[in-house]
Design a protein with these regions (language model features):
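Conserved glycine-rich Rossmann-like NAD(P)H-binding loop of the short-chain dehydrogenase/reductase
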Residues: 30-43
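Conserved residues in the N-terminal Rossmann fold of short-chain dehydrogenase/reductase
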Residues: 38, 65-66, 106, 198, ...
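Hydrophobic/aromatic anchor residues within beta-strands of the central parallel beta-sheet
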Residues: 64, 104, 165-168
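N-terminal Rossmann NAD(P)H-binding glycine-rich loop of SDR-like oxidoreductase domains
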Residues: 7-29
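Conserved Rossmann-fold NAD(P)-dependent oxidoreductase catalytic core, especially the SDR/UDP-sugar
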Residues: 87, 91-151, 155
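Rossmann-fold scaffold of SDR-type NAD(P)-dependent oxidoreductases
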Residues: 12, 79-88, 129
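Conserved Rossmann-fold cofactor-binding substructure of NAD(P)-dependent oxidoreductases
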Residues: 63-84
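Strand-loop microenvironment adjacent to phosphate/nucleotide-handling motifs in alpha/beta enzyme folds
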Residues: 121, 151-172, 179-349
Length: 349
């Protein structure tokens, strides 16, 4: 963590699952300060008390800023002294964004523009924007707004001065706030049907720790304008539900198929065919560099890419597919699941 020694890191949307994972990873390191920037004072107060109890000797490294990425001035107010930013603030629930698309635009699109504008003005060293697989070939409002977020990040990276701007794309982060596994656990414990949308639907899966690893990889190895993804495995929703049933004593016959929700796909894409054609293989990750050609139309129309026709997209149907036992092992290794199985219960990320 020496690259963060004495530095100030700001996390937008910092009271969420990702912000908690970063705090647990960083607080006992030599980092100077972590700023939690968010709009919910109750969540900030809960977080303040939690970390004062958990890490009393280092909790003073956490500083809380009430603000909203939708408001440029509140972003500017939080920037003085910030060295790096992890931009995690987002509206991410697919059905909610379908019904309120302009709210998704305000947070995911305009909010990102505000954060990046304020960061560039303040001379912040690096901003890592957290995106989603739903931004590739988007069909729903959440994915479309996150795709525009990425476009804004790449566009601003061309004129960002000393500020490095990168994006990371995630699949499903297991047991993050609003995800399905905690819902299934509650359904099993309450004796209710275990609801899933479509058994054959596939999703990339990763842990919160892997989510933090991806952001740190982008921070250390990404170049200005890059999009970085992890080579994540996938599983079907049916396999995931059965794994949770086996871990928590649920009955597979209690699984109830309720149908695909508003805006959902049968499978998700982490890299499009076009992105795969120029992606750099970096071991456990892919790096997609920005297309930094200018608006020289003659050159733009004459430069082609034959490689594009020879390659597939990277999606949750053609990546490595976890079987039931592999899925169960991956879920069972999560800290959230360990605490739930130990009887502590109601463990909130």
């Amino acid at each position: 963590m020496s690259i963060f020694a004495g530095k100030t890191l700001m996390i937008t949307g910092g009271t969420g699952s990702f912000g908690n994972a970063v705090l647990n990873r960083f607080l006992r390191t030599d980092i100077g300060e972590i700023r939690i920037f968010s709009r919910d004072e109750k969540k900030q107060d809960d977080m303040r008390h939690e970390y004062q109890a958990k890490y009393p000797d280092v909790a003073n490294k956490i500083k809380f800023f009430i603000g909203d990425v939708r408001d440029l001035q509140s972003c500017r107010n939080a920037m003085p002294g910030v060295d790096y930013i992890f931009h995690a603030a987002a509206l991410k629930q697919v059905p909610s964004c379908e019904f309120f698309p302009m709210e998704a635009v305000k947070t995911n699109v305009i909010g990102t523009d505000h954060v990046l504008t304020a960061a560039i003005e303040a001379g912040v060293g690096a901003v890592i924007c957290l995106s989603t697989d739903k931004a590739a070939y988007p069909i729903n409002a959440m994915g479309i707004t996150k795709a525009i977020e990425e476009k804004i990040a790449v566009a601003k990276s061309r004129y960002s001065g000393k500020t490095k701007i990168c994006c990371t794309r995630y699949g499903n982060v297991m047991c993050s706030r609003g995800s399905v596994i905690p819902l299934w656990i509650d359904q099993i414990r309450n004796g209710n049907p275990i609801t899933l949308t479509e058994p054959k639907m596939t999703r990339f899966i990763m842990s919160l720790e892997e989510a933090v690893d991806l952001v740190l990889f982008a921070f250390e190895h990404g170049q200005n304008g890059d999009i970085l993804v992890q080579k994540a495995p996938a599983c079907t929703i049916q396999t995931q539900a059965e794994a949770v049933c086996e871990l928590f004593g649920g009955k597979k016959e209690d699984i109830k198929v309720i149908g695909i929700r508003h805006g959902e796909k049968m499978y998700e894409t982490l890299l499009t065919k076009e992105e795969c054609a120029k992606a750099e293989d970096m071991g456990n990750f892919y790096r997609v560099p920005a297309d930094n050609r200018g608006l020289n139309y003659d050159k733009f129309f004459k430069e082609g890419d034959t490689k594009r026709a020879e390659i597939e997209e990277f999606n949750s149907d053609n990546t490595y597919r976890l079987n039931l036992q592999e899925t169960k092992a991956k879920i069972g290794a999560l800290e959230y699941i360990k605490k739930e199985l130990s009887g502590e219960g109601n463990f909130v990320q």
